[in-house]
């Protein structure tokens, strides 16, 4: 009995350790390792590498059936830490909310119910034109956060410039965030 209990506890500890060691993925690629390796894997999936800086890289390609998405891959200490997808810009409330709610529905189906905030700073405007104008003035927030065992996915709508806005998805990795937090705590 004791041997069986010991074996069970060992197996459970191994599973917990393994689960904690998994990184969040983007298009099936774990958010870890050197930037150049991650870029190559995205290029293998059809993305075009556009630019690289000390903080990450910019790629362009098809994501979730939408063409011309911009993908920002961020690094910390030369390792991939998070990914942000900027969908093509929209110029109307109807267009951007259709995209937001379509993606929210798909993410909900895959990851479960999100924590959601969808509201205007003041009273909701009476027309779609004024709703879009409120978005461009940062007077509303549409944000859904999906939490998983390996990280989170944040879906939002944000102003791009004075006349356009975009739906954005950010993939965050728990392991990378914890390592970053640990580094910050060491500095303090």
Predicted regions and their residues:
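Sec-dependent N-terminal signal peptides
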Residues: 4-17
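Non-cytosolic coordination micro-motifs
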Residues: 20-54, 88-188
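Sterically constrained small-residue positions within well-ordered secondary structures
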Residues: 10, 63-64, 74-76, 135-137, ...
């Amino acid at each position: 009995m004791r041997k069986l209990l010991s074996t069970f506890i060992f197996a459970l500890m191994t599973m917990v350790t393994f689960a904690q060691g998994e990184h969040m993925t983007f298009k099936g690629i774990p958010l870890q390792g050197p930037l150049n390796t991650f870029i190559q894997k995205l290029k293998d999936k059809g993305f075009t590498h556009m630019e690289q800086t000390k903080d990450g890289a910019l790629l362009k390609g098809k994501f979730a059936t939408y063409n011309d998405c911009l993908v920002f891959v961020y690094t910390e200490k030369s390792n991939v830490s998070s990914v942000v997808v900027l969908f093509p810009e929209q110029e109307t409330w109807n267009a951007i909310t259709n995209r937001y709610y379509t993606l929210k529905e798909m993410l909900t189906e895959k990851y479960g119910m999100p924590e959601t905030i969808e509201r205007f700073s003041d009273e909701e405007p009476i027309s779609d034109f004024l709703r879009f104008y409120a978005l461009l003035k940062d007077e509303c927030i549409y944000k859904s956060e999906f939490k998983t065992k390996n990280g989170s996915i944040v879906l939002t709508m944000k102003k791009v410039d004075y006349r356009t806005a975009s739906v954005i998805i950010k993939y965050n990795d728990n392991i990378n965030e914890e390592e970053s937090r640990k580094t910050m705590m060491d500095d303090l």
